[in-house]
Amino acid sequence: MKIVLQKVSQASVVVDSKVISSIKHGYMLLVGISIDDSMAEIDKLSKKVLSLRIFEDESRNLWKKNIKEANGEILSVSQFTLMAKTKKGTKPDFHLAQKGHIAKELYEEFLKLLRSDLGEEKVKDGEFGAMMSCSLTNEGPVTIILDSDQ
């Protein structure tokens, strides 16, 4: 499982020319699920996302607060392309990406774990399997790659 986590001041997802989700202060997550992933990886990385101290405190000291302490929101988007291998040739190879129906189940469990900690209204997502346009304003910029294998 791989996650690209970006600290944002705003983020949104558009499907078919309509904004389907948006947040203000928080994280934009791009989430890729591999053929080797199970609930163990989902649990591990959901805890990591929730516990990372990326936000500043009231005195503007960096790396002091996690997403909940900062009263932030999460916008999560499933993205199988994070599993791409590009070692050979010029066409990305996605054979390490989980099959859609299994990835969807695991992704929904990931969202459920985030929502159980932050609250239903604080965790939004895109549309699984859809072509989406994502926009964000990255703060910092802070961009962190989480990998369940590392």
Swiss-Prot record:
It is found in: Cytoplasm. GO terms for cellular component: cytoplasm. The gene is DTD1. Present with 4610 molecules/cell in log phase SD medium. GO terms for biological process: D-leucine catabolic process; D-tyrosine catabolic process; tRNA metabolic process. Belongs to the DTD family. This is D-aminoacyl-tRNA deacylase. It catalyses: glycyl-tRNA(Ala) + H2O = tRNA(Ala) + glycine + H(+); a D-aminoacyl-tRNA + H2O = a tRNA + a D-alpha-amino acid + H(+); D-tyrosyl-tRNA(Tyr) + H2O = D-tyrosine + tRNA(Tyr). A Gly-cisPro motif from one monomer fits into the active site of the other monomer to allow specific chiral rejection of L-amino acids. The lineage of its organism: Eukaryota, Fungi, Dikarya, Ascomycota, Saccharomycotina. Keywords: Cytoplasm, Hydrolase, RNA-binding, tRNA-binding. Its EC number is 3.1.1.96. An aminoacyl-tRNA editing enzyme that deacylates mischarged D-aminoacyl-tRNAs. Hydrolyzes D-tyrosyl-tRNA(Tyr) into D-tyrosine and free tRNA(Tyr). May also deacylate mischarged D-leucyl-tRNA(Leu). Also deacylates mischarged glycyl-tRNA(Ala), protecting cells against glycine mischarging by AlaRS. Acts via tRNA-based rather than protein-based catalysis; rejects L-amino acids rather than detecting D-amino acids in the active site.
